[in-house]
Swiss-Prot record:
Matching InterPro entries: RNA_pol_Rpo13
Top-level taxonomic group: Archaea
UniProt similarity note: Belongs to the archaeal Rpo13 RNA polymerase subunit family.
Organism: Saccharolobus solfataricus (strain ATCC 35092 / DSM 1617 / JCM 11322 / P2)
Region of interest: Disordered: 1-33, 78-104
Subunit structure: Part of the 13-subunit RNA polymerase complex.
Gene name of the encoded protein: rpo13
Stretches with biased composition (Acidic residues): 7-31
Composition skew (Basic residues), residue ranges: 80-104
Keywords: Cytoplasm, DNA-binding, DNA-directed RNA polymerase, Nucleotidyltransferase, Transcription, Transferase
Subcellular location: Cytoplasm
Protein name as catalogued: DNA-directed RNA polymerase subunit Rpo13
Role summary: DNA-dependent RNA polymerase (RNAP) catalyzes the transcription of DNA into RNA using the four ribonucleoside triphosphates as substrates. Probably binds dsDNA.
Protein EC: 2.7.7.6
Length: 104
């Protein structure tokens, strides 16, 4: 106890630091993952069902492969639409920024 703090105070300081570190870890982990749409969640559920059926022997490997490919094709269609929408919205935002900078 050279620092002048009692052992209880030292323990509280340590636990407060640990809580702060845990909060920082939680915040960064939430930022790392993209937001999932309902369609994305449904796709994940379908893929999980395919794996479940495959592992339980209800479908063959070839059937599972075909189902995964079908799901992926459907996902690609949705993803390409999303990218197109983002590209259009970015162009609009850039135009607005340019107009503001010209006026200002």
């Amino acid at each position: 106890m050279v620092s002048g703090m009692s052992t209880d105070e030292e323990k509280e300081g340590t636990s407060d630091e640990e809580v702060n570190e845990e909060k920082e870890v939680e915040e960064t982990s939430e930022d790392e993952f993209p937001k999932l749409s309902i369609q994305d969640i449904e796709l994940l559920m379908r893929n999980t069902e395919i794996w479940d059926n495959l592992l339980n022997g209800k479908i063959t490997l070839e059937e599972a492969k075909k189902l995964f490919e079908d799901n992926y094709k459907e996902y690609e269609k949705r993803d390409s639409r999303r990218k197109a929408k983002k590209a259009v919205s970015k162009k609009v935002k850039k135009t607005k920024k340019k107009e503001k900078s010209v006026e200002g």
